[in-house]
Amino acid sequence: MALLEIHDLHARVAAPGGHEILKGVNLTLDKGQVHAIMGKNGSGKSTLAQVLMGRETYQVTQGSVLYNGKNLLELSTEERACEGVFLAFQYPVEIPGVSTSYFLKAAVNAVRRYHRQDELDAMDFLVLVKQKMALLKMDQSFMNRAVNEGFSGGERKRNEVFQMAVINPTLALMDETDSGLDIDALRIVANGANSLRSPDRAILAVTHYQRLLNYIQPDAVHVMLDGRIVKSGDKSLALELEAKGYDWIEKEVAQLA
C-alpha cells in the first residue's frame, strides 16, 4: 500500500523571480520500503525533501502529493510533523538555551496531543530515551546539552537520528545524513535508521554516496537530474553510479530528449 504518492511535482524558490528547482517529480513509496534518491549537487534532491516537509522558502507551483491518503500540500509543517513526517537535516541547527531533553519531550508530547493521547510522564519518557540512546551509543549527558550547541558534525548527525528514533515517524526523510561521517559513526547512524523499519513505515534517504546503502538496504534507487527523477533501479544502480559517475545518465537522457 502506498504511503507517499508524488505526481508531477513542480516547485520554485519562494521569492520574486525565484527559479524553478523541481520540474515534474513522480515517485511512489510504499509502506515498509526504503528508497534512496541520488544525484549531482543542484539536481533537486534536498529541495524535494524540504518541500515534502513544508519548508516555506519553496513554493509548489504544480502537482500533487498524497501521504497516507491525505493531501500533504494542504498541511502546515507542524501538521505534517504530527502526522508522522520527519526530516533529518543535512545541516542540523543549534538551539541555544534549550536542552535536548526538553526539546524532545516537547516534540513527543506535541505529537501525542495531536492524536488525543496522554502525554508521557517523566519516567516513561526517560525509559524511551534510554532505549534509543543505547541503540545509537550516545552518552546520557547529551540530554542535558543545548540542542546541537557545541556538537561536532558527527554528533549533530547522530542527534538527528536519535530524535528520529525517539519521535518514531511514519515517513522518515533523511537529507544527506551520511555526509561527513566516519565509517563507525555511519554504521551507528544506519542502525538507528534501520530500527525504524517496519511494515507501517517508510524511509526516503537522500545521499551522494552508495556507502550509506551498504547499511540501509534500499528497495529502490532513484537518480535525480535537473529537478526530475530520470532513472530508477535497485541497489545495483547505486553501485554503478559509484563506479561510473553520472555522465552516462546525462547522455542517456539527452538521447531520449
Name what the model sees in each region:
Residues V93-T170:
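ABC-family P-loop ATPase nucleotide-binding domains
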Residues L173-T177, D184:
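Walker B catalytic motif
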Residues A220, M224, R228-K251:
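Conserved beta-strand-loop-alpha-helix hinge in the C-terminal portion
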Residues M38-K40:
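The feature captures the beta-strand-to-loop junction immediately N-terminal to the Walker
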Residues V13, L29-K31:
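Conserved hydrophobic segment flanking the Walker A/P-loop of ABC-type ATPase nucleotide-binding domains
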Residues L186-P199:
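Helical segment within the ABC ATPase nucleotide-binding domain
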Residues L4-I6, L22-G24:
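Conserved structural motif at the start of ABC-family nucleotide-binding domains
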Residues S64-R80, N148:
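ABC ATPase NBD Q-loop/coupling interface
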